[in-house]
Amino acid sequence: MKIGFVCAEYFGFKSIEGKLIPTSTHGGFGFLTKVKAEWLANEGHDVHVFTYAASYNYENNTAEELNENGVTIHLIPEKERVGKSSFSSGIKQLSKLKGNDFFREVLTEQNLQILQFEDTPTTLLLAEVNTIPKILIFQDPFDYYDVNLLVDSQNNYSSLIEGHNEQYVIKREDYKFSSEIAINYLHKKNFVSPIRKLLIPSNNITIFAEADFIGEKVKNLFKLASTPITVRNPIQIYDKTEEKTHKPSFVWVARWDAQKRPDTMLEIASQIPEYDFYLIGTATVSSKDNTSIQTKLETYFSRYPNIHILGFVQEEEKRKYIGKAWALINTSIREGLPITFLEAMAEGTPIISYTDPDRYVSNFGIRVDYSIKSYISAIYKVVEQKLYEKLAGKEREFIMREHEVNTIMNKHLDIYKKILNGETD
């Protein structure tokens, strides 16, 4: 079967002068696409991924083609990119999706049997003239509430934390954002309306959601007749988990931006010097504002010896940090169902989080209020109760049943076959 994936990011690399260089931007969707694509390729399918080249290592106006672990990766030049990481640049470029002939030509010349979209539904516009069957798995769509929440957070990046020190406070003007952009993003022609028009049977699109609550959100946002079926995301589950550190340690894995709130994590860690905190992730390359804020935060919090800012790390190394930690801490103001939650559960690591998608946190960790005090209380509770010992078995059992990669990907294959045989709506 010849299968294509469209994702704005992909967790791939290429060797340049002996150094391993990222081929695209990185994030949960990119990693997820990699897991799916490589599993299918390993099963003998012809798999193609269409993504954007990282701007700092690719400048030519032609698509570059790589092969990694059996997957053909088509890298589209950054100058053709639309829907960049920041809302403002993404909105300005969104109207150009229909005219992105370069991307469409690369996409359609492969004669794919199935084309699957893994991230923002705006990418669906790239294939509106494509007649092949398409699958859209809604991972993390923003509804009106989400956008308003993000506007508030981006306009007050540091003001939501309690008791912050004026020496490192990030001024409001360091992070510019227009609420008008957010309104246009959802209320006008740029998002909801064009996507809604595409989600009709004649366009040969099958819709799924990665979590139950996302299915409900999608139904309401796009006024669908029924709620999309949930197809859980896959995760590799290893036979042996990492041994927890003797001294309590905690891990945070995310982008450095207003949604993920690294400042909150750093403030929490600074108030608990007796435990170690490891922060994995970085600001997106295309966002100078986020990069500047990250630098300010790193400079100030470098004085705390229990805070370890690791930046970007390879997947195997990330898994070890998550596995050894007494808990994964998530400080995001809103989320879909993060891949890091699944990775933590696969390692028997509890989750401390304000967001609670499909009650994963309530069932396998501690759901907190959004305050420094609440997070700190949860951290001490994890240590005092050795919560990982109580939850590890339940987490592993659940994740094996609901997210194990072979089970989920065989479900994908069944879906593909039914679509090609005309057996689904």
Identify the function of each model-found stretch:
Residues I333, P357:
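Aromatic "clamp/platform" in nucleotide-sugar-dependent glycosyltransferases that forms part
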Residues K386-T424:
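A charged, aromatic-enriched C-terminal amphipathic alpha-helix characteristic of glycosyltransferases
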Residues T291-V313:
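Nucleotide-activated donor-binding/catalytic signature segment of Leloir-type glycosyltransferases, i.e.
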Residues F208, I235, E242-K260, L266-A269, ...:
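Conserved donor-binding/catalytic core segment of Leloir-type glycosyltransferases
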Residues K36, F142, Y157-I207:
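Membrane-proximal helix-turn-helix segments that form the acceptor-binding/catalytic region
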Residues L198-A209, G215-I235:
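Helix-loop-beta element that forms the nucleotide-linked donor phosphate-binding surface
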Residues F341, P350-S353:
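Short hydrophobic beta-strand element within catalytic cores of glycosyltransferases
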